[in-house]
Design a protein with these regions (language model features):
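Alpha-helical transmembrane segments and their immediate juxtamembrane cytosolic regions
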Residues: 1-272
């Protein structure tokens, strides 16, 4: 029964996470030549003068097939699909967590898996930190190792945390915001590149960020109009993740029209 549930869980994650990742990156690859014609992407070498940008060359059918094979094992991604690192990490971590949970429940008579899962999360965080230090992130596994502990913390907090009343919730939000302001003086977290000052910093920033979002969401849920808007955003998470870099382009285009900027600057990433 438990093995059957694990298989169904894995199948669901393949359909809801892996397939959108591969499909979206493949579509972006298919549209590369069109994007080059309208300057959403560019082969103009002047774009390299802007930090974080790269030039793009036209693709062939062979390129599309080869790159799709790479996307299928999370080997790289497209520039416009850059935000999908989150989908990749969530797929890898959720499957690993579920697989470990299945094995632990088979091995442990008590059925309590939080402690061994926590130990594994600590080991993976250390490995993710070492991967960051040497610049290793093959197939996104460095990011997945670092983020496993955050998934674990989410499981723990889901069990023990309950929303506070308005007064305490507002106080928790304010406290979490202050903690994040203080932490911001010492560094930042960039999980898309597996970048953070250290394991303890990552944990502290993540806990504070979670508290701010969790308590803030419960406060906003008391306002019907706001609650409905956020519910709609939640249901549209996947399209937002896939399309939001592309959605920046109309904003950049309007800015270039207003300032008379050169057309190749439309390809500036993420925005000019």
């Amino acid at each position: 029964e438990s093995a059957h549930r694990l298989a169904r869980f894995a199948k669901r994650k393949v359909v809801t996470l892996w397939l959108p990742f591969v499909a979206a990156n493949t579509v972006y690859t298919l549209l590369t030549n069109l994007f080059l014609k309208v300057n959403i992407l560019t082969g103009d070498e002047r774009i390299l003068d802007l930090p974080g940008n790269l030039i793009t060359t036209p693709v062939t059918i062979k390129d599309i097939i080869g790159r799709t094979a790479h996307w299928s094992v999370f080997d790289g991604g497209t520039q416009l699909g850059g935000a999908m690192w989150f989908i990749q990490a969530l797929f890898q971590i959720s499957l690993l967590y579920a697989g470990v949970e299945f094995l632990l429940k088979k091995l442990l008579r008590s059925g309590d898996t939080l402690i061994p899962q926590g130990l594994l999360a600590g080991v993976l965080l250390w490995l993710g930190w070492q991967a960051q230090r040497i610049g290793w992130n093959v197939w996104g596994l460095g990011i997945a190792a670092s983020c496993y502990c955050l998934f674990y913390l989410g499981v723990v907090l889901h069990r023990v945390q309950h929303p506070h009343g308005p007064a305490r919730g507002a106080l928790c939000c304010a406290g979490a915001f202050v903690v994040l302001l203080v932490l911001g003086q010492f560094g930042s977290v960039g999980l898309a590149g597996n970048s953070y000052p250290g394991p303890l910093y990552l944990l502290a920033a993540s806990l504070a960020g979670w508290m701010l979002v969790y308590e803030g969401a419960h406060l906003l849920a008391r306002v019907p109009a706001v609650s409905g808007a956020f519910s709609a955003l939640g249901r549209a998470t996947m399209p937002i993740v896939i399309l939001h870099f592309l959605a920046f382009k109309p904003v950049t285009w309007l800015g270039l029209l207003a300032t008379g900027g050169e057309s190749y600057l439309l390809a500036a990433f993420p925005i000019y």
